[in-house]
Amino acid sequence: MYQRILLASDGSALSRKAEHAAIDLASSLGAKLVALHVVPRYPVSYYEGSVTFSTREVARIEDASAARAQRAVDAVVDAATALGVGAKGVVVRSDLVADSILGAARKHRCDLIVMASHGRRGLKRVLLGSETQHVLTHGKTPVLVLR
């Protein structure tokens, strides 16, 4: 059925649920797993005329976020490998999270995307996050959405 599964995770509690489901699915199908974490770029200023950060501070924050993301995908790879699933972790830095997910699915020739219904930015009362909605409406790859 599916041979290569892309797991899109942001480290949220709901994404961790998707991680477990993706690993279990890959294991049951004999599929490979690509664990992806997209790290959004950090703005120099959040509000016009308010707090600004130096480019050095922004780089430090982005590097720390990327390091956390790498540890997260490494943990997914380790968990998958322990179950005999071939897996690799990918960290991408981009403000275009959904487009990065779709691009990674194409690049790694994935035939299924697994992701949570919403992540860190989603309010609990929101049924479907904007990134998930974008992936569903703009991609050609089937998507398994977990909540």
Residue ranges and their predicted role:
Residues 141-146:
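Short, flexible loop segments at boundaries between secondary-structure elements
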Residues 55-71:
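A short acidic, glycine-rich active-site loop
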Residues 112-137:
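Glycine-rich, Arg-bearing micro-motifs that act as flexible, cationic patches
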Residues 37, 116-118, 147:
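Short secondary-structure boundary segments
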Residues 1, 75-113:
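Structural beta-alpha unit
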Residues 50-54, 105-108, 131-132:
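Short, hinge-like loop/turn segments at secondary-structure boundaries
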